[in-house]
Design a protein with these regions (language model features):
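N-terminal loops that bind phosphate or other acidic moieties
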Residues: 1-133, 137-376
Length: 376
């Protein structure tokens, strides 16, 4: 029997590869000769660096950068040496979880550290980038990131504007005269699963501003400032299009990448499936195993396990999913390519017990074993 596992991380419990190897253990208890290919899975958000580094023989780098509030933070990112590709999660340098509730204010939070991570990767020889832009604490239109890469956003006196969304209102000139030259050699695949434009009722300020600490007055101001910034950019940079789907992602980071770098915005799961060449492994498999920490109706809306299932169904493969918890509305996943799904929990336990790494791996192996017994 040939089996491919591609399981998303169980957040706070198991990494993608740990879940896959636990499933492989369960399979081998039943069929010691089974050929099991354990592949990484992520959706472009949390866990993407970890999954791609572990699954693609990459290495982890740590760099001290400017955090969202201007304080130094250590950001972890990955490098896949074979393709000189850097894998970066924006949340590691400008994440909402790095800002305490009482300090959340997008007027002050900056993406400067994201640019510093990119610059560090460039200095280490990377020219391809996979960047996940979820979980941000910012609404600065990506200006901070671009400043770190050498773009200058100047006020009427010729000085760099202040960090955070508050600086947007003072931008009078944008120049690329000091951009690091290697940036022109770089290509970015930006994991973006939202379609919001930069401004307006569906723009980043209105939709995501409140969770970042914005008041109604701030939202109105930031939306106007981002609009003016976009208009200024359009006069100097022909790719600027604030209405393009996804430009409002991560407080305008989508707009920054599309306008000022050689970037494409793509579904996170599609990037991961492509980069890991999962389809090549699925073609020869008898069975595909996927899953995530919690399966529900949202899973069927295009989350990582369904991305795997769609790829598997393209080749007529059977797909089974395993999850830490399964909600009743998860049956929608059956219509999205997952033939059957199973919860891993063995009984009534506390959440803390269920999420312990050793328990989670054991539960995965035990449940997979029993399902495989039915198929042998």
């Amino acid at each position: 029997m040939k089996v491919v596992t591609a399981i998303d991380s169980f957040k706070g419990s198991m990494t993608s590869m740990e879940a896959g190897f636990a499933a492989a253990e369960g399979i081998h208890r039943v069929d010691a000769n089974a050929e099991v290919q354990v592949r990484p899975l992520a959706d472009g958000g949390e866990g993407t660096v970890e999954a791609l580094v572990a699954g693609m023989n990459g290495k982890t780098e740590h760099v001290k950068v400017t955090g969202p509030l201007g304080e130094p933070v250590i950001c972890e990112y990955g490098i896949i040496e074979s393709t000189k590709t850097a894998v970066i999660e924006m949340a590691g340098a400008a994440g909402i979880t790095q800002v305490p509730d009482e300090k959340r204010n997008p007027l002050y939070t900056t993406t400067y550290g994201v640019g510093e991570v990119i610059k560090d990767a460039i200095e280490k020889g990377c020219r391809r980038f996979i960047v996940g832009i979820g979980g941000s604490a910012t609404n600065d239109g990506g200006v901070g990131m671009l400043q770190a890469l050498g773009y200058a956003f100047l006020d009427k006196d010729g000085k760099q504007v202040l960090p955070g969304a508050r600086g947007l209102k003072d931008i009078a000139e944008i120049t690329d005269a000091y951009v690091i030259p290697e940036l022109a050699e770089c290509k970015f695949r930006v994991a973006c699963d939202v379609t919001n434009p930069l401004c307006g009722e569906l723009g980043c300020s209105a939709i995501y501003g409140p969770q970042k600490g914005a008041t109604p007055e701030m939202i109105k101001d930031m939306d106007q400032w981002l609009g003016a910034y976009a208009e200024l950019a359009k006069g100097r940079f022909p790719k600027a299009d604030p209405k393009y789907p996804g430009t409002g992602a991560a407080g305008g980071m989508g707009f920054a990448f599309l306008t000022f770098t050689d970037a494409v915005l793509e579904s996170g799961i599609n990037i991961v499936l492509d980069e890991t060449k999962l389809e090549d492994y699925i073609k020869d498999a008898d069975l595909v195993i996927t899953g995530e920490g919690r399966m529900d109706g949202q899973t069927a809306m295009g989350k990582a396990p369904v991305g795997v299932a769609k790829l598997a169904k393209k080749h007529g493969k059977k797909v089974i999913a395993f999850a830490g918890a399964v909600q009743r509305d998860a049956r929608a996943c059956n219509d999205a390519g997952i033939d059957a799904f199973f919860p891993n929990l063995r009984g009534v336990v506390t959440l803390e017990e269920a999420m312990k790494n050793e328990n989670a791996k054991q539960n995965m192996a035990d449940t997979v074993e029993q399902v495989i017994r039915l198929m042998k």
